[in-house]
């Protein structure tokens, strides 16, 4: 499982 990067826009 992968979490989205904290830099991705909402």
From Swiss-Prot:
Lyase recorded as keyword: no
Expression sites by tissue: Expressed by the venom gland.
Protein localization: Secreted
Keywords, ordered alphabetically: Hypotensive agent, Metalloenzyme inhibitor, Metalloprotease inhibitor, Protease inhibitor, Pyrrolidone carboxylic acid, Secreted, Toxin
Origin species: Bothrops fonsecai (Fonseca's lancehead)
Assigned GO CC terms: extracellular region
Modified residue annotations for Pyrrolidone carboxylic acid: 1
MF GO annotations: peptidase inhibitor activity; toxin activity
Family (UniProt): Belongs to the bradykinin-potentiating peptide family.
Organism domain of life: Eukaryota
Protein name: Bradykinin-potentiating peptide 10f
Any GO BP: regulation of blood pressure
Function: This peptide evokes transient hypotension (-11 mmHg) similar to that evoked by 0.5 ug of bradykinin, when injected alone into rats. It has a high bradykinin-potentiating effect (101%), when 60 nmol of BPP-10f are coinjected with 0.5 ug of bradykinin into rats. It inhibits angiotensin converting enzyme (ACE) activity with a K(i)app of 2.32 uM.
């Amino acid at each position: 499982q992968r979490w989205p990067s904290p830099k991705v826009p909402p």
